[in-house]
Amino acid sequence: MWYDKLNLLENLYVIFDVFGGYIMGIRSQFAIAVGKTSQWALKTFFKGGSSLPGKLALRIDPHILDSLAKDYQVVVVTGTNGKTLTTALTVNILRQQFDEVLTNPTGANMVQGIVSTFLQAKPAKGKKKFAVLEIDEASLSKVTEYIKPELFLFTNIFRDQMDRYGEIYTTYRMIVEGAAKSPDALIISNGDSPIFNSVETVNPRKYYGFDHQEDEEQMAHYNTDGVLCPNCHHILHYKMITYANLGKYYCPNCGFHRPELDYRLTEITHMDNVSADFVIDGNEYGIEVGGMYNVYNALAAAAVAEHYNVPAEKIRKGLGYDEKVFGRQEVIEIDGKKCTLVLVKNPVGLNQVIDMIGLAPYPFSLVCLLNANYADGIDISWIWDGNHEAFAEMNIPAVIAGGERHADMATRLKVAGIPEEKLKETKELTEVIEDIKKLPTEHVYILATYTAVLQLRKELANQGYIKGGMDRG
């Protein structure tokens, strides 16, 4: 009879479902074993790590993240600038409150790198486990195919690597679509950024931002991206601007305005080139890095901490943890020269770094290293939108232009007003390091694109100035 055949089909489906699940379980366990073994081999014989273990595990089981992340409360940090430091600060704070907080500090913020991060985790049964993951904007949607975060933290979106991301609204669509795959997850985003309030999302949202100045009618600089009202396309006005297009914005034509803030920075009590003190939601905090952009990173991390009910004293301790992050104002001593290494990758970030450097109370020399590999962004036209002209006003005694595109960097600095007698071009990093030793000042700022940072750190490690040259963190 037809219903007997139907029952047979149903029974076969159950059998294949169970058997298939068993096979998938075996595949996952085998993938994990291969990944962990390759990690051990890399650390034992090559003294370092990479995303290779994750790549191998994914080749065996494309759904391996399902198995690895299922016991974690996952927090995802994404955006153009500030991901790395915001992730580090968030991890530092949560570790004051929770026993097990996993993160990806080695620059592996794409899918295979995330898998490698989970492969490194030690078993912690019976404890509340967090994973705070920095994820590349273009990779978010791929990662959320397999991981279901409970919280997304959006830092900002600025023009960056146009050959990879396109314009800012394309990038925003990328991360909104990635977050939508976990529709119940909360998005905590920068309320001072108009783009984060430009479209409705399926996810619930909260906002952090600055509320530290009296209202004063202002307009963003004419070359600023993202200042058109998303509703009527008139130019936004501001009652307060922190930098670029961030601030207390509103549209005089249609009434579009900054949303109510859930987490508020109400005062900056001190800020220089190496530190900042401020008040968030009535509590005083400080960080051991300078610049307005880093205060935003601290505010974002504090917002996540408040969401998880971390007490203010533990937030304070986590923010004050003085361990410099890869390329984020890390200080490296080279034969008596105190070199501050800063990653730069787009005009907004560069301008914030220039503003921060301008706060230095002591004389310094400058090194600018420019590469144009895929991870840097092949299009280097962005250097012409950066305010290098400010360097000409700082009376810097010596400047080095280096990296694979040293000639382009030198041209930009000359056009900005750096005198030729103060400027030296040096392509090879071994020569750059030798030239740094001869600079006339004790303090040196090194501004470098991503792969230039990696190459410089590798060479510094080879010469014994640092450990773990190619790794971040």
Spell out what each predicted region is.
Residues 81-83, 108-109, 193-194, 294, ...:
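Gly/Ser/Thr-rich loops at beta-strand to alpha-helix junctions
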Residues 4, 8-228:
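Phosphate-binding loop of NTP-binding sites
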Residues 3, 9-43, 48-50, 233, ...:
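ATP-dependent carboxylate-amine ligase
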Residues 209-347:
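Adenine nucleotide phosphate-binding catalytic loops in nucleotide-utilizing enzymes
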Residues 100, 150-151, 185-186, 204, ...:
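Residues at the starts of beta-strands that form the adenosine-phosphate
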Residues 90, 94, 114-118, 298-308, ...:
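Buried hydrophobic packing segments
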Residues 134, 155, 188, 297, ...:
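Residue-level signal for inorganic ion chemistry
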Residues 86-87, 141-143, 163-164, 197-200, ...:
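Short glycine-/acidic-enriched loop or helix-start segments at secondary-structure transitions
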